[in-house]
Design a protein with these regions (language model features):
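Helix-start/capping segments and mature chain N-termini
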Residues: 19-96, 100-247
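Conserved, well-ordered active-site substructure
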Residues: 1-14, 233-240
Length: 247
């Protein structure tokens, strides 16, 4: 069983059933309009090393969940075959693989070489919250990334941006998840804060090297360590620029 640590107090106000119904109707309408505004594909990005796709089973499971959520046809056996063919054509080296599923159920994959991951990176804290961090386009990985693109660092030395929600809780980066060393443990933001549950994050939660918790942006200076994590690059030590006390 996963343990969850909380580093923030939450206060909620009662909501009437009629107000709740109106809220849910508004959310459903907004989600419909967001989906209809532009076509998108479901996406998985994974590491291929010497012909072996990293965590392929977990990536395909996540794609299947996204396909079910968006009502996209998904043929798992075809996805396995598509990945296997691509892997066989890249028997050597390290590659960034993008596996995409469109609305009609068509799958395609392509690979690009990736340079070695840096030993450490710089991250910056977003200046404003990510609105609607609970959006389906945050919780599921797709080619719709406008909500992330506007947080791209302008400084070329900065690798990515640390996002936070409207409650002031840290969520993720635009290209991966986060871990913070607090009170002697590595904590990753809990999924309910509004983030994409990454495959590498899930692996480390399962093996016990990470636990979930709520981390306030205002408390970042207390972290004894920071790491950026994703399935493509693994675990990378990070420093956060612009804080009074470096992490």
């Amino acid at each position: 069983m996963r343990s969850t640590q909380t580093y923030a107090a939450e206060i909620t106000a009662p909501i009437s059933s009629s107000s709740h119904g109106e809220w849910q109707a508004w959310r459903s309408k907004r989600a419909f309009l967001a989906r209809a505004s532009a076509p998108f594909e479901i996406l998985e990005t994974l590491r291929l090393k010497d012909g072996v796709p990293h965590n392929a089973v977990r990536h395909l499971m996540r794609m299947a969940k996204a396909a079910a959520h968006f009502d996209y046809p998904f043929d798992r056996e075809l996805a396995v075959t598509t990945l296997a063919r691509l892997a066989a054509s890249r028997p050597n080296g390290v590659w960034r693989v993008r596996l995409l599923l469109d609305r009609s159920g068509r799958l395609h994959a392509h690979a690009n070489p990736i340079p070695p991951s840096p030993q450490a990176i710089l991250l910056q804290l977003a200046l404003r919250p990510l609105e609607d961090a609970g959006s389906e386009f945050v919780r599921f990985k797709t080619t719709r990334r406008e909500h992330y693109d506007c947080f791209a660092p302008s400084d070329p030395r900065v690798f990515d941006t640390i996002l936070w929600n409207e409650r002031g809780e840290i969520t993720e980066c635009t290209r991966g998840n986060l871990a913070f060393r607090l009170n002697g443990r590595w904590i990753t933001p809990v999924a309910s804060c509004g983030l994409l549950p990454g495959v590498e994050r899930e692996v480390r939660l399962a093996d016990g090297s990470l636990v979930e918790g709520v981390i306030q942006a205002a408390d970042l200076h207390r972290a004894q360590g920071v790491a950026f994590i994703n399935s493509l690059r693994g675990w990378i030590r990070a420093n956060v620029v612009g804080l009074d006390s470096p992490c």
